[in-house]
Amino acid sequence: MGSTCSTPESKEQKRINSVIDKQIRKDEDDEIGNQKLLLLGTGECGKSTILKQINILHSSGFSKADLKNVAGTVYSNIIQGVATLLKAKDHFYYELSTPELDADAQHILSLADSSKDAMPFIPLTFNAIKRLWHDPVVQKTFERRAEFQMMDTLVYFMNELDRINNADYIPTVDDMLRIRIPTMGVVQQTIEIKGTKFRIYDVGGQRSERRKWIHLFDNVNATIFISAINEFNQKLNEDGQTNRMKESIKLFETICNSRWFVQAAMILFLNKRDLFEQKLKTTSINVLFSTYQGSNDYAECVAYIQMRFERLNKYSDIKKIYTHVTCATDTNQIQLVIDSVVDMVIGRNLRGTGME
C-alpha cells in the first residue's frame, strides 16, 4: 500500500501553491473593481499632460520635491527650443541680424548638443537666450514653425524666462504641465475617482513606441484617443514628410475599429484648441482637407475635423464616440471633461453588470 504521509518538500510546495492561488484570486478581485483606461495618440499630442492633470485633480498632485526635480527639464526645454530655431534658421539660409549673435548661437548649440543635464543659467547663457529670442531673424524663423518640429510651449517658457532665471527658482504646477519629456514605454498609474479605481496607462506615441501597446489591449474599459488639432499643417518628426494630423486620423481609425476595443468606451479628445484657434487666424484647414470649403471660423473648423474623425467609426450602430474639445493645460476645463468621462465610464460599467 502506498504511504499517505506527505514529505516536507510536498508540504512546502502545497504552501507555496496556496500562497500563489490566494494572490491570483486577490489580483482577480482587485481587477473586478478597477477600470482600465488607455491614453493613446501620436507623439506630442498631450497624453502625458492629461495624465498630470488627472494626478493633480484626483490624486496627490505634485510635491515641492517633484517640482524641484523638473527644474533641469525646464532649462533643457528652453535650450533645446532655441537650438531648434537656430538649426531651422540655417535650413532656411537666414543670417542672424548682427555678427555678435553668432557667438551666442554657438554657445546655445554647444549646450544643446551636450549630454549633461541642463543646469541653472549662467549670465552668459541667459543673455544669449534673450538676445537670440528677440532677434528679428529668429522671430522670422519662429513664424515658419509649421515647417519644422519644435516644442509648442517654448513661447510660454520664454515669457517666463526672468522668473525661471531666478536663483531660487522652483517650477510651478503650470511649468510642470508644459515641460516636454517624451514618453518611453508605458507609464501606469492607479487613481481612485468617485469611489472607483482607474488603472490608467500612458504609452509613448512615436511610431517606434506603438509596438509596445498591444500587450495592454486586453480587458480595456475605455480608451481616450488624443489628437492635437493644431497640427493640421505640421510634419511628423519621425520622417519629416507625413502630415501630423493625417497620421493621427489614420491611427485613430485603426484604434477605433480594432477588435480589442469593440466593447470599450471610445473617447476622443481634440486637444490644443487654444493653439488651433490661434493658427486659424493665418492658416486654413484646407491645406490638409482639400474638400473643406468653409471659413476659418473656429467652431466651423472644429465641427469639420470632429466629423472627419467620427465618420471612421465602422461600429457606429453599437458604439458611440464621445468627443471633447480640450486644452490639456487648462486645469479647470480638464476637470469638467474628466468628470464627464468618469461618469460615463462608471455608468457603462454599472449597466454592463446590471446594477443600474
Swiss-Prot record:
Family listed: Belongs to the G-alpha family.
The organism of origin for this protein: Caenorhabditis elegans
SUPFAM superfamilies reported in the protein's UniProt record: P-loop containing nucleoside triphosphate hydrolases (SSF52540), Transducin (alpha subunit), insertion domain (SSF47895)
Lipidation residue positions, type N-myristoyl glycine: G2
Protein's name in the database: Guanine nucleotide-binding protein alpha-15 subunit
Binding site residues for Mg(2+): S48, T183
Highest taxon of source: Eukaryota
Matching CDD domains: G-alpha
Subunit structure: G proteins are composed of 3 units; alpha, beta and gamma. The alpha chain contains the guanine nucleotide binding site.
GO MF annotation: an example: GTPase activity
Record keywords, A-Z: GTP-binding, Lipoprotein, Magnesium, Metal-binding, Myristate, Nucleotide-binding, Palmitate, Transducer
Lipidation (S-palmitoyl cysteine): C5
InterPro entries the UniProt entry points to: Gprotein_alpha_su (IPR001019), GproteinA_insert (IPR011025), P-loop_NTPase (IPR027417)
Any one Gene Ontology BP term: adenylate cyclase-modulating G protein-coupled receptor signaling pathway
Spans annotated as G2 motif: 175-183
